[in-house]
């Protein structure tokens, strides 16, 4: 189908567009502009300088001679007298001459120190060695040289001048190596989660940045029927609201999971609210970590968190740094109350 069309185009290759446009009359050019306006009404294919229509096609009102106009303007400028000043210049100087202020010269006067006669007599009669000992005791090391300090300290410690050194040696800096990457095999963990492997109790996907969003949703779908995984962590995996919504649907069904960690992700208030609403019906989850998201969640979301913690008595650990005092206090009281209930149940079980 394409070959006949290309053969028809061969006829127009050698045509000169400029010559065709030059042979068109003014009426034909206007018709061509109308057709082009229908094809491209916003003139998106034209440069910005050519989108405005020509509005200067008017008949001249008279002859125009540039040289004659310039000579006329020059003649008018020479014949026109300058306007005289209404207030003549008298040469009077106004204002004050700027004189920089001289900064006061600071003079230091030596303070006269009066000592007790006994101390003054002792310092006057003291030898250089005794004065060096006194300076070393007082910590005034800038008053004595390194040689004198060596003679004083070395003689007292039994060290000669050749082997004496007062250079402070710094400790070696211990190298801090980067943490190794997460060794978890994502595909294998997903397969074992779907198969409900009894030996798979904890899934740790922390700091694995390249997990696709559909794969994280598959984990949430697999956890709906899994009865062995008790701890699931996907911190710093670039999870977003769709992932949070998928895990919220999982929490409504799952009755085994005890801990869920979604910290340091891109979840907004919409995803967090979905998780909070799911926990109203969940009676098994005891720990939830949702802190350090990309953006602040806001007061309304924090109030819903506090309300959920007051209604759900099974949450014992809640990882989130509240920004408002009211929700923070309510959440702290609710967590304390839930832990007290667990302690009372344990005590009652011990008595029985």
From Swiss-Prot:
Ubiquitous. Gene3D superfamilies: Ribonuclease Inhibitor. Keywords: Actin-binding, Cytoplasm, Cytoskeleton, Phosphoprotein. Signal peptide: none annotated. The modification Phosphoserine is found at residue 25. One of its GO terms (cellular component) is myofibril. InterPro entries: LRR_dom_sf, TMOD. One of its GO terms (molecular function) is tropomyosin binding. GO terms for biological process: actin filament organization; erythrocyte development; mitotic cell cycle phase transition; muscle contraction; myofibril assembly; pointed-end actin filament capping; positive regulation of mitotic cell cycle phase transition. Pfam families: Tropomodulin. It is found in: Cytoplasm, Cytoskeleton. Binds to the N-terminus of tropomyosin and to actin. Interacts with FLII. This is Tropomodulin-3. It comes from Homo sapiens.
């Amino acid at each position: 189908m394409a070959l006949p069309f290309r053969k028809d185009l061969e006829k127009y290759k050698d045509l000169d567009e400029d010559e065709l446009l030059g042979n068109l009359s003014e009426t034909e050019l206007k018709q061509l502009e109308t057709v082009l306006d229908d094809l491209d009404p916003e003139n998106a294919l034209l440069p910005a300088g050519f989108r405005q229509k020509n509005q200067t096609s008017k008949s001249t009102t008279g002859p125009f001679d540039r040289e004659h106009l310039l000579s006329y303007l020059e003649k008018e400028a020479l014949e026109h007298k300058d306007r005289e000043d209404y207030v003549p210049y008298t040469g009077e100087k106004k204002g004050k001459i700027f004189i920089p202020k001289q900064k006061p010269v600071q003079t230091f006067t030596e303070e006269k120190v009066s000592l007790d006669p006994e101390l003054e007599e002792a310092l006057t009669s003291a030898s250089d060695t005794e004065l060096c000992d006194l300076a070393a005791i007082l910590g005034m090391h800038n008053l004595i040289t390194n040689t004198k300090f060596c003679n004083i300290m070395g003689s007292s410690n039994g060290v000669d001048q050749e082997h004496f050194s007062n250079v402070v040696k710094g400790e070696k800096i211990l190298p801090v190596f980067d943490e190794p990457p997460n060794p978890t095999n994502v595909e294998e963990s997903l397969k074992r989660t779907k198969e409900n492997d009894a030996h798979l109790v904890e899934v740790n996907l922390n700091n694995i940045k390249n997990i696709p969003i559909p794969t994280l949703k598959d984990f949430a779908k697999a956890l709906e029927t899994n009865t062995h995984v008790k701890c699931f962590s996907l911190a710093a995996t670039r999870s977003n609201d769709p992932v949070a919504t998928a895990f919220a649907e999982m929490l409504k069904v799952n009755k085994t999971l005890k801990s869920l960690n979604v910290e340091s992700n891109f979840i907004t208030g919409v995803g967090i609210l979905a998780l909070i609403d799911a926990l109203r019906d969940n009676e098994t989850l005891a720990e939830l970590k949702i802190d350090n998201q990309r953006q602040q969640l806001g007061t309304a979301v924090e109030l819903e968190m506090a309300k959920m913690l007051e209604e759900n008595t099974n949450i014992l650990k809640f990882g989130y740094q509240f920004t408002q005092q009211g929700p923070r206090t309510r959440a702290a009281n609710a967590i304390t109350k839930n832990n007290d209930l667990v302690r009372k149940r344990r005590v009652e079980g011990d008595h029985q």
